[in-house]
A protein has these predicted regions:
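Flexible phosphate-sensing "switch/lid" loops adjacent to ATP/NTP-binding sites
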Residues: 1-323, 330-347, 354-355, 362-368, ...
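Active-site proximal loops enriched in glycine and acidic residues that flank catalytic Cys/His/Asp
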Residues: 8, 38, 212, 239, ...
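Cysteine-nucleophile active-site neighborhood
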Residues: 17, 21-25, 341-435, 441-443, ...
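Glycine-rich, charge-decorated loop segments at or immediately adjacent to ligand/cofactor-binding or catalytic sites
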Residues: 180-187, 384-393, 493
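A generic structural signal for well-ordered coil/turn residues at beta-strand boundaries
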Residues: 204, 231, 288, 344, ...
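Acidic/polar loop patches that form or flank catalytic/metal-binding clefts of enzymes
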Residues: 207, 269-272, 377-378, 397-404, ...
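C-terminal and late-domain segments of enzyme folds
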Residues: 432, 436, 442-533
Length: 533
């Protein structure tokens, strides 16, 4: 097993995840089996209870674990399904160590950061890699070098090299090379300090990826190589790209796979990026275009809906179409009381969410799409609120609502799941992960081309069974249900060009070569709507 550790310096959010994903993709396209681990040095056990404004989208994996959005990036780039073991947090590590101490596993030792916590981190990496049965494990360490919360993980990086052998472990350090002043001069000083800090921890980077708005100038790259004590060719330039999907080609041009193979003693293999290059070209150069409104409550941070954004782009690439997203804050719709900001869009997407803030704005958008025959896709909360809107304005149940929003409401067409009634804890307690969905027909079966599917879930509420017959008699059909037939999973509206919604999250299984069928259907319907004028 080979391990590639990806660290970051200067500041967070400069592209460690893309560096790691792109490197993994290149090696995968060369024929290696690649897996990935993301380390998050925060005290939360997982990302499940975090506000999207804190870390962006909460990504749900097949096994139901709620993790950092970077894991979604790995799944999309590597076309794989990861598990809870591939996300290591400080909270999870401390929890495991304390439980072992209480259980007596340390046989009376004084439990300390070194060796116990550090060893727990290393064991987590080794177990995740072993379970994946991979040739290479990419390990991304969140945060930046020098952060106090990252120190145990930096020590774990050093220890991993000693335990597994230096020939099996390498470090790629991603750092910022800012461009300063009107003359556009690239500065190396932040990188110098970052590398010095890393070396002071006993970790020597093998490759440095320099993030900058422009390609690294030759003298700048040479200077970085000199003070980092690495060959010039081991300094990789990572300028701003047309899209993140162009980054693997940028790295390939600079022979990154060859550098990795040489450092880790791997047999040289040439990556075949033919399909990926075609995809990257299509995602950036669609001949057609549509605009879809995304009605959210965290739209100031686009990463809150990154899986939806990428799902729409993947669908567009397959349809030779560029998808423009009109980001609309649901509370703004609510406050204004009108839907003028929706005018001119070719489709509407209402994603998942929780709580009353913005709920009425989402209901307004579902009503507008239904009445104006604009293609609509609702997901999770968007599925539930489409049902609330239909109950209010078609069935005439004026007080219809979700029990989440109005616990004492007269018509709770959305009710809490029976198994959730006595749940008190918030973390990892929802109906999560892959569940079977049986599709009986309709547009859903045309899109999925299958009567049985498995999709990822994250919810506490469901359609109230008492109202299903009444709703279906009025034209809203539930064409997807769980295997018991009692839990509603997919709805579609009769007589509408495309009005679909799902209780599950189709965006989490969307891949570059296989976009979510429901997102594909939305983009296709949006194109048809635009064409019909």
């Amino acid at each position: 097993m080979k391990y590639i550790l990806v660290t970051g310096g200067v500041l967070s959010g400069i592209g460690k995840g893309i560096t790691s994903s792109s490197t993994g993709l290149l090696l995968q396209c060369a024929g290696y089996k690649v897996t990935a681990v993301k380390i998050d040095p925060y005290l939360n056990v997982d990302a499940g209870t975090m506000n999207p404004y804190e870390h962006g989208e909460v990504f749900v994996m097949t096994d139901g674990s709620e993790v950092d959005l970077d894991l979604g990036n790995y799944e999309r780039f590597l076309s794989c399904n990861l598990t809870k073991d591939h996300n290591i947090t400080t909270g999870k590590v401390f929890k495991n160590v304390i439980e072992k101490e209480r259980h007596g596993d340390y046989l009376g030792q004084t439990v300390q950061i070194i060796p116990h916590v550090v060893r727990e981190i290393v064991d987590g990496i080794l177990n995740a890699a072993k379970d994946a049965d991979a040739d290479i494990c990419m390990v991304e360490l969140g945060g930046t070098v020098g952060d106090i919360e990252s120190m145990p993980f930096m020590e774990a990086v050093r220890l991993l090299g000693r335990l597994e052998g230096k020939e099996n472990v390498m470090v790629i350090h991603t750092t910022l090379v800012p461009v300063v002043g009107a003359v556009g001069e690239q500065k190396t000083k932040p990188t110098q300090h970052s590398v010095k800090e890393l070396q002071g921890l006993g970790i020597r980077p093998d490759i440095i990826v320099g993030r900058s708005s422009t390609k690294l100038e030759e003298d700048i790259a040479t200077k970085i190589a000199f003070f980092a004590d690495i060959p010039r060719e081991c300094v990789i330039s990572a300028p701003d790209a047309r899209s993140i999907y162009d980054v693997p080609m940028v790295f390939l041009e600079q022979k990154l796979p060859e550098l990795v193979e040489e450092r880790l003693g791997l047999k040289p293999k040439k990556p075949d990026l033919t399909k990926w290059e075609d995809f990257a070209e299509r995602i950036s150069n669609g001949k057609k275009n549509v605009e879809i409104a995304l009605i959210g409550k965290y739209t100031d941070l686009k990463d809150s809906y990154i899986s939806h954004e990428e799902s729409l782009r993947y669908a567009g690439a397959l349809l030779d179409c560029k998808v423009k997203i009109r980001w609309i804050e649901a509370p703004d719709l609510e406050d204004s009381g009108n839907t003028k900001t929706l005018e001119g869009v070719n489709g509407v997407l209402v994603p998942g969410g929780f709580g009353s803030r913005g709920a009425e704005g989402k209901i307004m958008s579902a009503k507008w799409a239904r009445e104006n025959k604009i293609p609509y896709l609702g997901v999770c909360f968007g599925f539930q609120l489409a049902t609330v809107e239909f109950a209010r304005n078609v069935l005439g149940l004026k007080n219809a609502n979700s029990a989440e929003l109005d616990p004492d409401g007269q018509h709770s067409v959305i009710d809490i799941l029976p198994e959730q009634e006595d749940v008190k804890d918030m973390g990892a307690t929802m109906r999560l992960g892959d569940h079977e969905v049986i599709i009986s027909g309709g547009v859903a079966k045309e899109l999925y081309k299958n009567g049985t599917i498995f999709e990822r879930h994250r919810h506490r509420y469901e359609i109230n069974p008492k109202y299903i017959d009444q709703i279906e008699a009025s034209g809203m059909k539930y064409t997807g249900r769980d295997k018991s037939g009692r839990r509603m999973e997919i709805l579609e509206l009769e007589g509408h060009p495309y009005f679909m919604a799902s209780q599950f999250h189709p965006e989490f299984k969307s891949r570059p070569d296989a976009p979510s069928p429901l997102h594909f259907g939305l983009v296709k319907a949006a194109l048809d709507h635009k064409k019909s004028g």
